[in-house]
């Protein structure tokens, strides 16, 4: 069952991944209209120019009947509807989703994102440019600028932590594909509190292949608890920076390979950056510090992810191919260094786009004797609705 990974295979994978990312990042998605340079019809009468309506004027004209001039929403009794309009002044709600999702619902109607049919389509009444103006006005209803905008909630990589504070449940599996097989599953619960903060719990459960080929499992690993704080965010620059402090408790069995035998402190910074053409960059760097030094080594790690999100169908599911670069070094003199690469792709599964899957493969670059791992997760953004909603 032993397998080697020649360097030329790794180089070929890297070249293919970089070529794919570069193609999606630097090629334009629009095609100029063939009639763009043709002269229009001539007229002898002087044109009359009027100022285009503002976002506020468009909102009051097209949206305020249901959503209210103040953005708080008109009562369902007054409207005769079953679904209450959202409160745009509630920053906890209004800040989370990017403009693109709001415009999709307004342009195509509620069902395009798995919401009520009572939200009509405005595609015949308002252009996408006018909807963007309306969105700019809707953003003024949340007056607390402490809340990071939803555009900064970049796709979650398989290993690198996100900088954006979220409400998510993630079930992930890491499968050793070589030698004696092993599977480590993690159930991750994340809950946001306040504008910038998040608490996280990680429950790992492991399975291992024995020498005789039989499997044993259900072993508890080292449980982790962490708190994240967004230190800086700026929608204009497309940047977000966070700090997380995580504690790994020695709940796993060290002899079975599912625990470290000591409490481990793991502080780290995470950074997210929106790039042109739907691309993005995410970086994480931090330290691992075992409380009992005899049971572990101090380690520094860095992780970087480059990817791009796109929609083959303008209003359909989102595809996000990514490649992660993962490095770690022990801090003692003459310590070990490890570098891995992990190509992967995240896909939204339902129309509401709050349930996602990510599949990837982690490949050792510096040492072919280390095992490769198949990695996969299912992510549920539970703030946006139940797991079975929006399909």
Can you describe what each PLM-predicted range is?
Residues 32-58:
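Electrostatic cytochrome c docking/interface patches
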Residues 55, 59-70, 119, 134-138:
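The canonical Cys-X-X-Cys-His
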Residues 49, 56, 68-104, 155, ...:
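Gly/Gly-Pro-rich "capping" loops immediately C-terminal to redox-active cysteine motifs
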Residues 80-139:
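Extracytoplasmic electron-transfer domains, predominantly the class I c-type cytochrome c fold
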Residues 14-25:
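Bacterial N-terminal signal peptides
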Residues 1-8:
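N-terminal secretory signal peptides that target proteins for export/translocation
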Residues 129, 145-391:
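Transmembrane beta-barrel domains of Gram-negative outer membranes and organellar outer membranes
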Residues 62, 129, 135-149:
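Aromatic- and Gly/Pro-enriched helix-to-coil junctions and flexible linker segments
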């Amino acid at each position: 069952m032993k397998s080697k990974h020649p360097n030329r295979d790794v180089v070929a994978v890297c070249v293919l991944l970089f070529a794919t990312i570069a193609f999606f990042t630097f090629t334009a998605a629009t095609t100029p209209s063939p009639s763009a340079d043709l002269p229009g019809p001539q007229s002898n009468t002087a044109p009359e120019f009027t100022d285009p309506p503002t976002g506020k004027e468009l909102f009051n004209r097209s949206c305020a009947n249901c959503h209210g001039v103040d953005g708080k929403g008109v009562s369902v009794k007054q409207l005769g509807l079953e679904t209450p309009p959202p409160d745009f002044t509630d920053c906890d709600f209004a800040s989370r989703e990017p403009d693109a999702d709001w415009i999709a619902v307004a342009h195509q109607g509620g069902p395009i994102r798995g919401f009520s049919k009572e939200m009509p389509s405005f595609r015949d009444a308002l252009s996408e440019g006018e909807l963007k103006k309306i969105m700019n006005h809707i953003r003024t209803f949340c007056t607390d600028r402490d809340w990071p905008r939803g555009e900064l909630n970049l796709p979650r990589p398989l290993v690198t932590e996100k900088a954006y504070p979220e409400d998510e449940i993630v079930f992930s599996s890491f499968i050793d594909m070589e030698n004696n097989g092993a599977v480590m599953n993690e159930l991750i619960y994340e809950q946001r509190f306040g504008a910038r903060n998040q608490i996280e719990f990680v429950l790992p459960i492991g399975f291992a292949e024995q020498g005789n080929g039989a499997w044993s499992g259900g072993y508890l690993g080292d449980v982790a608890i962490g708190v994240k704080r967004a230190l800086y965010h700026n929608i204009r620059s497309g940047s977000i920076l966070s700090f997380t402090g995580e504690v790994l408790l020695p709940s796993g069995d060290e002899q079975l390979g599912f625990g470290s035998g000591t409490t481990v402190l793991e502080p780290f910074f995470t950074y997210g950056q929106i790039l042109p053409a739907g691309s993005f960059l995410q970086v994480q760097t931090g330290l691992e510090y075992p409380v009992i030094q005899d049971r572990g080594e101090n380690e520094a790690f860095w992780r970087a992810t480059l990817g791009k999100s796109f929609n083959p169908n303008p209003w359909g599911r989102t595809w996000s191919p990514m490649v992660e670069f993962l490095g770690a070094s022990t801090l003692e003199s003459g310590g070990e260094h490890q570098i891995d690469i992990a190509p992967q792709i995240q896909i939204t599964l339902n129309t509401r786009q709050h349930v996602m899957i990510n599949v990837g493969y982690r490949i050792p670059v510096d040492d072919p004797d280390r095992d490769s791992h198949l990695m996969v997760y299912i992510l549920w953004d539970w703030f946006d609705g139940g797991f079975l909603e929006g399909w």
